[in-house]
Amino acid sequence: MQIRLANPRGFCAGVDRAIDIVNRALEVFGPPIHVRHEVVHNRYVVEDLRQRGAVFVEELHEVPDDAIVIFSAHGVSKAVQEEAKRRQLQVFDATCPLVTKVHMEVIRYAREGRESILIGHAGHPEVEGTMGQYDKSYGGDIYLVEDEADVVALTVRDESKLAFVTQTTLSVDDTARVIDALRQRFPAIIGPKREDICYATTNRQDAVRQLALECGLVLVVGSVNSSNSNRLRELAERCGAEAYLIDEPSQIEASWLKGKAAVGVTAGASAPEDLVQQVIATLKNLGGEDAEEIPGREENIRFSMPKALRP
């Protein structure tokens, strides 16, 4: 049985930066360091940081006065930012710069008097943060759509002054269809020159397409609450492969491998490489050959740390 590795896979620049911010804050200030929401959506990473002294909370009222708090890579609403400022909490913002770019877009659209439509998944923290960055005091509103049916049902105030943005971790193909539906329904709508789906999401989806063509089974290393990891599994299935999302190698079932000449392995943008290597070792113990990496797009993007945390 061949083992084929997706390229690229695993950590993206935004995840690297967010984890580095928590680790560096622990080094500089010592524990505890409070983090609003899981800094990235990976159980393995979160547990490792928790053992080092990070305290994960869902809301700021759980953070003591005079504490240090880190905002997760998914971003936060304006209300959360203002609450932290009012309480004079020391904040380090681990929001991915590509998410911040989307925030800047909805802030600008609100000031221009445009209503905004966000393509995204309800309940995801990135979506909640972006929705909360739109300033309704300018008279407009922001609407969430997940699919074409939502576009059909949507009612806005002024179809001539509309803009759209997207969550950064969506399916590229699904998002393209929703954007087409928006343009057909609202011909005057404007949006970013390129959709807001980030480079890492796009690259990992392209790699999975190739993997699914070569392998009857695709294993995606990632946690169930990771949006981009779920999109990778769904895409592999659409491309004709059997696919599973796994948090760790112990979840692999030998029955999945029965009759498979090749198995593909990839990882979501918040899954560490050492988990991938553990999965490969397990597959080899179950009869797999040495892993072979497929050709892919090189990534060399790095995002800078907050000044106060730089060595």
Swiss-Prot record:
Keywords: 4Fe-4S, Iron, Iron-sulfur, Isoprene biosynthesis, Metal-binding, Oxidoreductase
Binding residues annotated for [4Fe-4S] cluster, in chain numbering: 12, 96, 198
Pathway entry: Isoprenoid biosynthesis; dimethylallyl diphosphate biosynthesis; dimethylallyl diphosphate from (2E)-4-hydroxy-3-methylbutenyl diphosphate: step 1/1; Isoprenoid biosynthesis; isopentenyl diphosphate biosynthesis via DXP pathway; isopentenyl diphosphate from 1-deoxy-D-xylulose 5-phosphate: step 6/6
Binding residues for (2E)-4-hydroxy-3-methylbut-2-enyl diphosphate: 41, 74, 124, 168, 226-228, 270
Active site: 126
Pfam family, one: LYTB
Domain of life: Bacteria
Chain's role: Catalyzes the conversion of 1-hydroxy-2-methyl-2-(E)-butenyl 4-diphosphate (HMBPP) into a mixture of isopentenyl diphosphate (IPP) and dimethylallyl diphosphate (DMAPP). Acts in the terminal step of the DOXP/MEP pathway for isoprenoid precursor biosynthesis.
Family: Belongs to the IspH family.
Name of protein: 4-hydroxy-3-methylbut-2-enyl diphosphate reductase
Chain's gene name: ispH
